[in-house]
Amino acid sequence: MANQEQIIEAIKEMSVLELNDLVKAIEEEFGVTAAAPVAAAGAAGGGDAAAEKTEFDVELTSAGSSKIKVVKAVKEATGLGLKDAKELVDGAPKVIKEAMPKEDAEKLKEQLEEVGASVELK
């Protein structure tokens, strides 16, 4: 079994996308959430179908013809490095940001559509 230092070293070498997948796997395996307590309370209320949705995932469905502009916009919006942003755009359809407030999600959608991307809020 790996010791704590080996695990930390392995995590240091991961990309942001790999870290995101790791967090999701840990959440599923142990039945926990990495969200802040306020966000977790909102997520618990999200199970009610009649409740208004307050958090949205922004999904890039297509980069369109201006792929370079879309990569730059994704890089700015996510804080990813250029390589990771390009991989995310190349892998479309992909969720760019999760659990965003409606207003922020709509702003990001508008920014990405301005540079030619196709985006959906889920």
Curated annotation (Swiss-Prot):
Task: Identify one Gene Ontology CC term for this UniProt entry.
Answer: cytosolic large ribosomal subunit
User: What Gene Ontology terms for biological process does this UniProt record contain?
Assistant: translation
- Provide this UniProt record's keywords sorted from A to Z: Ribonucleoprotein, Ribosomal protein
UniProt GO molecular function: mRNA binding; structural constituent of ribosome
Q: Keyword check for tRNA-binding, yes or no.
A: no
Q: Which InterPro entries match?
A: Ribosomal_bL12, Ribosomal_bL12_C, Ribosomal_bL12_C/ClpS-like, Ribosomal_bL12_oligo, Ribosomal_bL12_oligo_N_sf
Keyword Protein transport in the entry? The reply is no
Q: Which Gene3D superfamilies match?
A: 3.30.1390.10, Single helix bin
Q: State the family named in the UniProt similarity comment for this chain.
A: Belongs to the bacterial ribosomal protein bL12 family.
The protein's role, per its UniProt record? Forms part of the ribosomal stalk which helps the ribosome interact with GTP-bound translation factors. Is thus essential for accurate translation.
Assembly description: Homodimer. Part of the ribosomal stalk of the 50S ribosomal subunit. Forms a multimeric L10(L12)X complex, where L10 forms an elongated spine to which 2 to 4 L12 dimers bind in a sequential fashion. Binds GTP-bound translation factors.
Q: Quote the protein name from its UniProt record.
A: Large ribosomal subunit protein bL12
Q: Which organism does this record belong to? A: Staphylococcus epidermidis (strain ATCC 35984 / DSM 28319 / BCRC 17069 / CCUG 31568 / BM 3577 / RP62A)
- What taxonomic lineage is listed for the species of origin? Bacteria, Bacillati, Bacillota, Bacilli, Bacillales
